[in-house]
């Protein structure tokens, strides 16, 4: 839409268009088009025509900054940013570019003051610009492990989103981060600053600090809250708010100290455990408490020959490749686990004999571009990885890799590390060959339980001042930090796909059982943390609280609390919007299978089938429940039940739902179920299945080919 002479000028100044940029709007438009077309040099030439008369025009300065950014001429960028800020102090773009420049050229410690000083101002002037800043800050904070700050800035980005696409992008980011096992569960929450009780001193000073925090000056607010806490050292609200603001500012060390101090002063045990958990998790993100991990990179002469050599090494275990993603330019040619011993050396009877992975080997295929040869990466996973392990890979690769020292090759600089308190834990076993899937699942769970209950409990922890959890649990004064250490451990086991039952481990160590939480309204629930929701007393809270807790807990994938929630939903007949009873049963069955509680899985199969009958389910839904029950029977090694269900599926589903047969074949392959009876059913030669089908009028046989050709309803299971 064309601008009128007396419209506000698009440059953002307080002047009217006629008295500001109208005389040069066409020339400015030409510069902007060249920037959009990624022609920065031509854009700068076009901009020169407007100088020196219009050298300080804000639109011209913005476009010149963009051009120099594209040319990576950072010093000129900074000079122009300073000109824009000095000539137009109310232009949010000056501060936006300043923050972007520091994010690219400096570290978070140097960038944080700029963000906290100017972001709220940018949001008031140009919310869309503030949205961009918040999203870029999120990327930086993720790289630094400042996960509570990530949630804070994502929430602010959602407030500043001015389009449906931007809002969807933020919600998608929340969804992806909630699914990430790399982010400990207690961090997946937006905590709120707490109000000071009315009967406490320092009310006026507290209100002033809250105003500072409302302006998103997190570090300044944290220091002021901390100063107030020194006046009233046993008021947990002050130290909690200080710790929370430090966490939002990305100061992990200060956040750990203040949140831990707040936990010490809380009378409620579970709330104290929650804050101590946050403190320990922040501590573990600090570089000084992490053991560095190593990554090596080498040029490959011939990828195919290299793979042939690596396949022969018994301490390398080749992994199935994931499906290729369209956004990946160079998908891996192969991935290997580097094991601590030969891959076939362990036995299922001796958990300590099983090989565990201590590193990974990644090979990227060569491409036609000579600047992109084949590459081999060797990466350590745990501190047990030594120089000898690295040398093993180099020796096996032999002449197929170039070990000549050069920039960007050999040992790569890296900030990656693993916290000392979990460095001695390794859940990544390689099961012996020839096991069924159910046997592998049981072995993996048994090994993970062995690592947690037998090894971790005897491991000296820095968070417990060098004591083991078993020792600390015997001292009532240390119950709170030990329970917090268990919560931290649960976040580690989640990355290994082992769902730790926190209450069970507490009881094993003689610690207090997890105290259930009861809240009477959805508003109370909204103010609760993720950790609080995990201990909800689902049978004692109103139905509306259960309904609102469901999406929150479902997103956490915390198996044991989620199973309790689903039990309560079913027992109390609570309706979950857009989530019917069969769906509840399906999720509960899946979770029961995940933890190998096969009796519960069978019960949920029966409940789900009954629920489907009540709502008049179609054939596909009925088939799904039979497939679920078949999986449970296979995992239970109940061959008679497997045969019964296979015959039923062959009679009722193979013709009408062809994919059913493929799903069953995959299950049978995983479970190594290939007895003659199973083969007969799947090949269509099982006489009982054939006979039952004839009585139903549903079989095809060679003798009835003519009837089939004339449209008869005749078919043999397995006949395609």
Predicted regions mapped to residue ranges:
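Short Cys/His-rich zinc-binding micro-motifs
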Residues: 2-15
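Solenoid-like repeat scaffolds
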Residues: 18-19, 48-55, 82-90, 117-127, ...
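Alpha-helical segment of the N-proximal tetratricopeptide repeat
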Residues: 26-79, 97, 136, 140, ...
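Alpha-helical adaptor scaffolds
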Residues: 62-66, 82-83, 96-109, 116-124, ...
């Amino acid at each position: 839409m064309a601008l009128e002479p007396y419209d506000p000028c698009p440059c953002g100044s307080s002047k009217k268009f006629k008295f500001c940029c109208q005389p040069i709007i066409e020339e400015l438009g030409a510069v902007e088009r060249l920037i959009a077309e990624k022609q920065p040099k031509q854009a700068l030439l076009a901009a020169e025509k407007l100088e020196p008369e219009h050298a300080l025009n804000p639109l011209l300065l913005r476009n010149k900054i963009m051009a120099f950014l594209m040319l990576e001429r950072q010093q000129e960028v900074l000079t122009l940013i300073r000109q824009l800020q000095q000539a137009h102090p109310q232009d949010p773009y000056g501060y936006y570019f300043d923050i972007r420049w520091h994010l690219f050229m400096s570290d978070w410690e140097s960038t944080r003051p700029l963000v906290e000083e100017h972001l709220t101002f940018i949001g008031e002037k140009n919310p869309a610009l503030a949205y961009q800043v918040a999203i870029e800050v999120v990327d930086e904070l993720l790289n630094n492990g400042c996960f509570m700050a990530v949630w804070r800035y994502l929430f602010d980005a959602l407030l500043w989103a001015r389009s449906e696409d931007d809002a969807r992008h933020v919600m998608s980011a929340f969804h992806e981060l909630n699914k990430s096992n790399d982010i400990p569960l207690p961090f997946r929450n937006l905590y709120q600053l707490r109000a000071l009780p009315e009967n406490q001193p320092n009310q006026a000073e507290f209100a002033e600090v809250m105003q500072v925090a409302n302006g998103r000056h997190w570090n300044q607010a944290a220091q002021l809250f901390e100063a107030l806490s020194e006046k009233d050292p046993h008021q947990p609200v002050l130290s909690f708010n200080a710790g929370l603001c430090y966490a939002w500012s990305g100061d992990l060390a200060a956040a750990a100290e203040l949140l831990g101090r707040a936990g010490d002063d809380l009378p409620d045990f579970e709330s104290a455990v929650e804050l101590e958990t946050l403190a320990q998790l922040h501590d573990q993100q600090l570089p000084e408490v992490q053991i560095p991990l190593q990554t090596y990179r080498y040029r490959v002469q011939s990828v195919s020959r290299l793979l042939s050599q690596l396949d022969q090494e018994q301490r390398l275990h080749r992994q199935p490749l994931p499906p290729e993603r369209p956004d990946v330019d160079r998908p891996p040619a192969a991935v290997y686990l580097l094991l601590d011993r030969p891959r076939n050396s362990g036995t299922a009877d001796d958990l300590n004999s099983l090989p565990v992975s201590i590193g990974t080997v990644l090979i990227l295929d060569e491409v036609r571009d000579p600047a992109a040869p084949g590459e081999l990466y060797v990466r350590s996973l745990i501190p047990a990885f030594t120089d000898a392990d690295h040398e093993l890979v180099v020796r096996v690769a032999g002449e197929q890799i170039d070990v000549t020292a050069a920039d960007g090759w050999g040992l790569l600089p890296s900030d990656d590390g693993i916290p000392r308190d979990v460095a001695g834990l390794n859940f990544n076993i390689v099961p012996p060959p020839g096991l069924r899937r159910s046997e592998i699942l049981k072995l993996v769970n048994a090994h993970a339980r062995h690592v947690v209950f037998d090894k971790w409990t005897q491991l000296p922890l820095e968070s417990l001042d060098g004591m083991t959890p078993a020792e600390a649990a015997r001292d009532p004064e240390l119950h709170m930090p030990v329970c917090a250490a268990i919560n931290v451990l649960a976040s580690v086991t989640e990355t290994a796909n082992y769902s730790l039952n926190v209450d069970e481990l507490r009881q094993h160590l003689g610690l207090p059982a997890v105290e259930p939480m009861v809240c009477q309204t959805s508003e109370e629930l909204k103010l609760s943390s993720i950790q609080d929701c995990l201990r909800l007393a689902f049978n004692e809270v109103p139905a509306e609280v259960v309904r609102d807790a469901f999406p929150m807990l479902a997103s956490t994938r915390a198996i044991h609390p989620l199973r309790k929630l689903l039990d309560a939903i079913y027992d109390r007949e609570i309706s979950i919007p857009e989530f019917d009873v069969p769906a509840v049963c399906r999720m509960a069955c899946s979770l029961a299978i995940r933890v190998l509680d096969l009796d519960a899985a069978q019960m949920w199969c029966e409940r789900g089938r009954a629920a489907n009958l009540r709502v008049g389910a179609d054939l596909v839904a009925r088939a799904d429940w039979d497939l679920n029950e078949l999986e449970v029977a296979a995992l239970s090694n109940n061959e008679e039940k497997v045969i019964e269900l296979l015959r039923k599926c062959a009679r009722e589903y193979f013709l009408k739902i062809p994919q059913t047969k493929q799903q069953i074949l995959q299950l049978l392959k995983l479970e190594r179920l290939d007895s003659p009876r199973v083969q007969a059913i799947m090949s269509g030669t099982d006489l009982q299945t054939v006979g039952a089908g004839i009585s139903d009028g549903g079989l095809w046989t060679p003798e009835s080919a003519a009837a089939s050709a004339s449209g008869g309803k005749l078919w043999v299971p397995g006949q395609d």
